Amino acid sequence: MSADPTVPQLLVPLAEIGDRGIYFEDSFTSWADHIGHGAAIAAALRERLDPTRPPHVGVLLQNTPFFSAMLAAAGMSGIIPVGLNPVRRGAALARDIEHADCQMVLADTASASTLDGIEHVNVDSAEWAEVIDAHRNSEISFQNAAPADLFMLIYTSGTSGDPKAVKCSHSKVAIAGVTMTQRFGLGRDDVCYVSMPLFHSNAVLVGWAVAVACQGSMALRRKFSASQFLSDVRRYGATYANYVGKPLSYVLATPERPDDADNPLRAVYGNEGVPGDSERFGCRFGCVVQDGFGSTEGGVAIARTPDTPAGSLGPLPENIEILDPETGQQCPVGAVGELVNTAGPGRFEGYYNDEAASAQRMSGGVYHSGDLAYRDAAGYAYFAGRLGDWMRVDGENLGTAPIERVLLRYPDAIEVAVYAIPDPVVGDQVMAAMVLTPGAKFDVDKFRAFLAGQSDLGPKQWPSYVRICSALPRTETFKVLKRQLAADGVDCGDPVWPIRDQS
């Protein structure tokens, strides 16, 4: 295989595999039959698509064999799937469909309710089953794709505004699958457990692509379930799993049993896990967990090493620097700035139909991640939030993530989100939303005493207000919707406690 593999190159061997394939609920489909399903989908869609327009097809599906077969169809035919987020509804979802130039939308029954009258094909319907049956004997052929050719459009989470459609090439997807396969020594005897949503880059690049690259099997779950995670791993013999965000925390919150480590899981890979969860998860379930740092765009990637301090993203790689957003100069040790790839775009291939956003991301010929971080004297990086999270408090720029890490030490806190609300005079005030352990009552004096005892929390970093929530609003990929919390402000339906002296 060439240094830059493509998705078709990974798919070709699967067409001959009859003893490994897709596990889903109580069913099993061999790779050979799965590739045949992909060929039928490709043929059916080609009949319906206008060849003079981009062959873009919106996909609004849970993690089902059809979604995986649709990805196979894309690799075989050049049809471009566009992952649609079920959290988006009505006009917002219609905007995403139009923005990506989707000629049609495929949805399953479980997801179709979010379309609110938008025209679509229900892939669970008898009519669609007849269409696929009519193409069951379609020729299994694979396009001769170039590594740089577009494979899929994947929308960003849109936590700070309208999501952007990230271009994902064949090489971007295939290299991720091959890299993970080699890193963890995966092969034909392995089973990859994929429960993260396939409309998101994490599930496609380090879930689906890994299963395809290693030529083992894949176990799909419609939606992630913490309570069913371990039973699924045992049921399907899963040896590898991926995650994004909080799933490790949710699994760790399930009741611990003495036989938790009695399972086939060997390796877990993901990003944006809670600091410390990787070690706790690996110890409890007897597996290796690697947490990386990156985004759908792929312009900056940081990997933890065995000697990485707790809470750190890992050592700054060559050409990844922390720069002052205003001056463009390198930040000194301990100062918060933007993570920038000074060597160029990395794996960023642009946003579809948004030249302005693409140009802004590559302003000055370097890749601007929009992520804030700081480094210690040894060169290890620490996440400090997003540029949109930057707070201007009493004339000083503050990142949200360092404050969140401190507040998570509070004995009664299990989830924390820090965000800015307008200061009545000028700038911002710090506000924190907290979820407490079951049965805990918020004690404002106890909390103030806790803050006073934290040597790494400055006076300006103290929250002006704390909101006590039953749950934090999140996206389908478990990212906190801070813009929603900020919009609520202090006049919300939850208890809000003033903390910092406002005088």
Curated annotation (Swiss-Prot):
GO terms for biological process: fatty acid biosynthetic process; long-chain fatty acid import into cell. Keywords: ATP-binding, Fatty acid metabolism, Ligase, Lipid metabolism, Nucleotide-binding. It is an enzyme of class 6 (ligase). It catalyses: a medium-chain fatty acid + ATP + CoA = a medium-chain fatty acyl-CoA + AMP + diphosphate; a long-chain fatty acid + ATP + CoA = a long-chain fatty acyl-CoA + AMP + diphosphate. GO terms for molecular function: ATP binding; long-chain fatty acid transmembrane transporter activity; long-chain fatty acid-CoA ligase activity; medium-chain fatty acid-CoA ligase activity. CDD domains: FACL_DitJ_like. Belongs to the ATP-dependent AMP-binding enzyme family. This is Medium/long-chain-fatty-acid--CoA ligase FadD17. It comes from Mycobacterium marinum (strain ATCC BAA-535 / M). The lineage of its organism: Bacteria, Bacillati, Actinomycetota, Actinomycetes, Mycobacteriales.
